[in-house]
Curated annotation (Swiss-Prot):
Entry note: cofactor: Binds 1 divalent metal cation per subunit. Can use Mn(2+), Fe(2+) or Co(2+).
Stated name of the protein: Inosose isomerase
Coiled-coil ranges (or none): none
Cofactor: Mn(2+); Fe(2+); Co(2+)
InterPro entries tied to this protein: IolE/XylAMocC-like (IPR050312), Xyl_isomerase-like_sf (IPR036237), Xyl_isomerase-like_TIM-brl (IPR013022)
Catalytic activity: scyllo-inosose = scyllo-inosine
Binding-site residues, a divalent metal cation: 142, 174, 200, 246
EC number: 5.3.99.11
Domain of life from the UniProt record: Bacteria
Role this protein plays: Involved in the reversible interconverion of 2-keto-myo-inositol (2KMI, inosose or 2,4,6/3,5-pentahydroxycyclohexanone) to 1-keto-D-chiro-inositol (1KDCI or 2,3,5/4,6-pentahydroxycyclohexanone).
Pathway stated in the Swiss-Prot or TrEMBL entry: Polyol metabolism; myo-inositol degradation into acetyl-CoA
Organism from which the protein derives: Bacillus subtilis (strain 168)
Gene3D superfamilies the record matches: Divalent-metal-dependent TIM barrel enzymes (3.20.20.150)
The family this protein is said to belong to: Belongs to the IolI family.
Gene transcribed to yield this protein: iolI
């Protein structure tokens, strides 16, 4: 299992340049690049070609652009903006050699029936699949374990991906999101491991279903999530690609970037190495 760093983990105490240097120093294999803040900040003083050269001359490689946000159930203007943004991402992926784009479903106070959510998600993901295919890029749908997210359980996301039925459309499995809205471990055990593209590891304080927010995340192995169950299920269904550590805890943003990156690796390896060689 390869080790990846998700830049949310140092959102307020680092930048892309420093994340790369420290992840390279501490033996990470991949990085997920945040396209909404850290990449634009980097591009103020550097070019995409500079970034591509860094990846070509170092061990660490780009795993994913994170993320295409709120892709489904948009009005015409919103949909057109999503398509334009995604096409730009494809060019970035081509320049940098990025394998995946993470797609995050709409979060809204508006109540939308599940059938409408599914239809829109399937339609848009199919359109994105067509755009991504010539680039060799895959789309990883990340359900979000929050009541206001239109796709908030593993079961709902898996059904959408199965309906799309494209080799370049799969899932992000995030342990926090899986736990936060009570997704069923039996559903994961019955899933096709090839449909899971990226595994996000994290843990959480022990709040009830529906109350958890990203700030409640803690280092892997230090919270209430049954990570052993998640990892053993992933092993059972044949997933062994990449584990990406992703936290959003304000307390951890007070650490130095190096402390956070080192601790993220140690806690992740301690938990994952019981099931996978790293």
């Amino acid at each position: 299992m390869k080790l990846c760093f998700n830049e949310a983990t140092t959102l307020e105490n680092s930048n892309l340049k420093l994340d790369l240097e420290l992840c390279e120093k501490h033996g990470y294999d991949y990085i997920e690049i945040r396209t909404m803040d850290k990449l634009p900040e980097y591009l103020k003083d550097h070019s995409l070609d500079d970034l591509a050269e860094y990846f070509q001359t170092h061990h660490i490689k780009p795993l994913a652009l994170n993320a295409l946000v709120f892709f489904n159930n948009r009005d015409e203007k919103g949909h057109n903006e999503i398509i334009t943004e995604f096409k730009g991402m494809m060019e970035t992926c081509k320049t940098l050699g990025v394998k995946y784009v993470v797609a995050v479903p709409l979060v809204t106070e508006q109540k939308i029936v599940k059938e409408e959510i599914k239809k829109s998600s399937v339609d848009v993901l199919t359109e994105l699949s067509d755009i991504a295919e010539p680039y060799g890029v895959k789309i990883a749908l990340e359900f979000v374990g929050h009541p206001q997210c239109t796709v908030n359980t593993f079961e709902q996301a898996y059904e959408i991906v199965n309906t799309v039925n494209r080799d370049n459309v799969g899932l992000v499995l995030d342990s926090f999101h899986f736990h936060a809205m009570g997704s069923n471990i039996e559903s994961l055990k019955q899933a096709d491991g090839k449909k899971i593209f990226i595994y996000h590891i994290d843990d959480t304080e022990d709040f009830p279903i529906g109350f958890l927010t990203d700030e409640d995340r803690v280092w892997p192995g230090q919270g209430a999530i049954d990570l052993d169950a998640h990892l053993s299920a992933l092993k059972e269904i044949g997933f062994s690609d990449v584990v990406s550590v992703e936290l959003f805890r304000p307390e951890y943003y007070k650490l130095t970037a190096e402390e956070a990156i080192q601790t993220a690796k140690k806690t992740t390896v301690d938990v994952v190495s019981k099931y996978f060689s790293m």
